[in-house]
């Protein structure tokens, strides 16, 4: 579960290393975001000499959470970290690579470009 002020790792090579969630896109008073939700975040740590800089406000989609994800077949998936992929306004990733495993639920939510870049889909 991701809420405002939560720090997340970045799972792509867009230039950001760490994000802080400042808003959850969707209903006006959503408290938590889960895998596949789009958030507004600020970059807290960035790689030098890259297009994205520190304190820049961006959009990102959540690809991993520490909170368990329960599927319809009874399977429970839990990751070791909270991670997101930086996206543009159309929902396309800004980076060209995605690191780490991501959940299969992103394919149902039309983030197929992110799924195709991922090395492992659980």
UniProtKB/Swiss-Prot annotation:
What's a single GO MF annotation on this record?
A: large ribosomal subunit rRNA binding
User: Can you supply one Gene Ontology CC term for this chain's record?
Assistant: chloroplast
Keyword Transmembrane assigned to the entry: answer is no
User: Would I find Plastid among this entry's keywords?
Assistant: yes
**Record keywords:** Chloroplast, Plastid, Ribonucleoprotein, Ribosomal protein, RNA-binding, rRNA-binding
An annotated GO BP: translation
| SUPFAM superfamilies listed in its UniProt record | Ribosomal protein L14
Where does the protein principally reside?
plastid
Q: Which InterPro entries match?
A: Ribosomal_uL14, Ribosomal_uL14_bac-type, Ribosomal_uL14_CS, Ribosomal_uL14_sf
Q: Which Gene3D superfamilies match?
A: Ribosomal protein L14 (2.40.150.20)
Tell where it localizes.
Plastid, Chloroplast
Q: What does the similarity note say?
A: Belongs to the universal ribosomal protein uL14 family.
In UniProt terms, what function does this protein have?
A: Binds to 23S rRNA.
Quaternary state and partners of this protein?
Part of the 50S ribosomal subunit.
Q: What is this protein called?
A: Large ribosomal subunit protein uL14c
Q: Which organism is it from?
A: Calycanthus floridus var. glaucus
Q: What is the lineage of its organism?
A: Eukaryota, Viridiplantae, Streptophyta, Embryophyta, Tracheophyta
Question: What gene, per UniProt, encodes this protein?
Answer: rpl14
